[in-house]
A protein has these predicted regions:
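Conserved phosphate-binding catalytic cores of ATP/NTP-utilizing and phosphoryl-transfer enzymes
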Residues: 59-85, 188-213
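A mobile "lid/hinge" subdomain adjacent to the ATP/sugar-phosphate binding pocket shared
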Residues: 152, 253, 259-299
Length: 299
């Protein structure tokens, strides 16, 4: 079977670029799209017409008097009912499922007050059951549900095909991606939570690409991700996963890695729990056993 033509590929690239620009600006004129995309007015009109016909974009007449004898200009915006996605968070102290539309409006959300994730297959099925309920209760067109993203707590590099090892969750080489996709019939993207958070910061243009940025997510444990020269460096790559194992010289707290003083146990939520509960520094529980204690503490 032959590959797609270059023209087809270019149309996909241009449609994707237009959707990103419209999403970033909220509402934007065709003239601005010509300026940003470097295309002619006719080219912009063809691409926008395709996206309007598929229900992804809405066209709104600009306010004010039109210039000259031509028709009044129009702005383009995302159609709130054009597409939907699911977002799933799995950390020691936060486990939730959220359904949003393409304009970032939350249509439904469920937070698990306390969930035992010791059995990953059972836990993932619980997330999927809630996702099915949110989809049904929202009344959305299931065919417009594009996919889902999972942000989970880990300091390890994610394995190929969405396999996850997470000391914080107590998971070892779990096929998270395939389990979710089989249960929901949707494409999934699996990310370390620190990287997912950094992507959101970059998308919102809160990160200066020229300077570079390292994001450190400090919860029960500690995760990190970086953005340099237009590239994301995920948790577990180039030593980023080891930030949590930088050692405090005056700390006697024993880390799961066998060393003492690691930030993972001496500078995170685990340290707060240890202090509140009076646990000895050489007998801290593993992370996967801490979520219930943390939930009770923050109530």
């Amino acid at each position: 079977m032959g590959s797609q033509s270059p023209n087809t590929d270019m149309r996909k690239i241009n449609r994707s670029a237009m959707l990103r620009l419209v999403a970033k600006h909220g509402q934007i004129s065709r003239n601005k799209l010509c300026e940003y995309m470097g295309l002619t007015g006719a080219g912009i009109s063809r691409i926008s017409r395709d996206l309007i016909d598929t229900g992804m974009l809405l066209e709104t007449a600009q306010e004010g008097v039109s210039k000259g004898a031509g028709r009044r200009g129009s702005d383009l915006s995302l159609n709130p009912d054009g597409a939907y996605v699911l977002g799933i968070t799995i950390t020691a102290n936060r486990k939730s499922v959220t359904l949003v539309n393409c304009t970032q409006q939350v249509l439904g959300q469920w937070d698990f007050d306390a969930m035992d994730v010791a059995n990953p297959e059972k836990a993932i099925q619980s997330f999927c059951d809630v996702a099915h309920s949110l989809i049904e209760e929202s009344g959305i067109d299931r065919n417009k549900l594009l996919g889902a993203g999972v942000g989970l707590a880990t300091t390890e590099k994610l394995g190929e095909n969405g396999y996850v090892t997470s000391p914080i969750l107590g998971w070892n080489n779990v096929p998270v991606k395939s389990l979710f996709e089989a249960a929901l019939g949707l494409p999934f993207i699996i990310e370390a939570r620190a990287l997912a958070m950094l992507r959101a910061e970059v998308w919102a243009e809160k990160v200066d690409n020229a300077e570079g940025t390292i994001l450190i997510n400090n919860g029960v444990g500690m995760g990190a991700a970086a953005y340099f020269d237009g590239r994301f460096i995920p948790t577990g790559v180039a030593g980023l996963g080891n930030i949590s194992h930088l050692s405090l010289p005056d700390s006697a707290v024993l880390c799961r890695c066998g060393r003492t003083g690691c930030l993972e146990y001496s500078g995170t939520g685990a340290a707060v729990l240890a202090d509140v509960n009076g646990w000895p520094p050489n007998k801290l529980p593993v992370f996967s056993e801490l979520s219930g204690d943390l939930h009770n503490l923050v109530q």
